């Protein structure tokens, strides 16, 4: 069993002002995405300026935050927010959903592309390899917060999370680190290696949807579901799996359509 590192979730406290590591991880994700995007900008569109890129990253970040919050409200704890709607604005108490954030990013990409002469999938193909930076940073934030841990296990790398998070004090899968490794590191490598060569429009977006969906679906088997939801079917199906399955299907469909529309790309890949 590995010891859980006792890291104060509050990175900096100045009087009543507290800056949490989880919030800083969002800044790391946004900053990292901007740096990588700036390196790939000339390949994407030589006419784009760094200012236009900054505008894109800003609106994508807004999509993540607003979409992530609304996604959590709608899919994970709707009854609580209906009973007390003001809770929606208490984002410092947690409650963000990737799938909602993903929808927010898609809406932001569509809106920004429409105003800047880019199609939806042109922008999504550019943005997709950036997303794992934010995903990985977010999972580190979850780990520091000692939240979203996994099921009890006796594997050698199991961890006992702090009593405030897990009163049962059981050795558990550090599922946040699994998601960091898969959704952050592995997905980053897959997408950025794949995107090095010219690909047909929609293919990179499809790869993101496919592999994120697979990774999330798999990790859900060892992650404890949200207490207010539990398992939704057959004693093992979680909300995360229900929301990830359409991503897997959509990813396969996008890749198939991309290469069907551009047979020369399929031959080049072979």
UniProtKB/Swiss-Prot annotation:
GO terms for cellular component: plasma membrane. A 1,2-diacyl-sn-glycero-3-phospho-(1'-sn-glycerol) binds at residue 139. GO terms for biological process: lipoprotein biosynthetic process. The keyword Cell membrane applies. It is found in: Cell inner membrane. InterPro entries: Lgt. Keywords: Cell inner membrane, Cell membrane, Membrane, Transferase, Transmembrane, Transmembrane helix. GO terms for molecular function: phosphatidylglycerol-prolipoprotein diacylglyceryl transferase activity. Catalyzes the transfer of the diacylglyceryl group from phosphatidylglycerol to the sulfhydryl group of the N-terminal cysteine of a prolipoprotein, the first step in the formation of mature lipoproteins. This is Phosphatidylglycerol--prolipoprotein diacylglyceryl transferase. It comes from Pseudomonas syringae pv. syringae (strain B728a). The lineage of its organism: Bacteria, Pseudomonadati, Pseudomonadota, Gammaproteobacteria, Pseudomonadales.
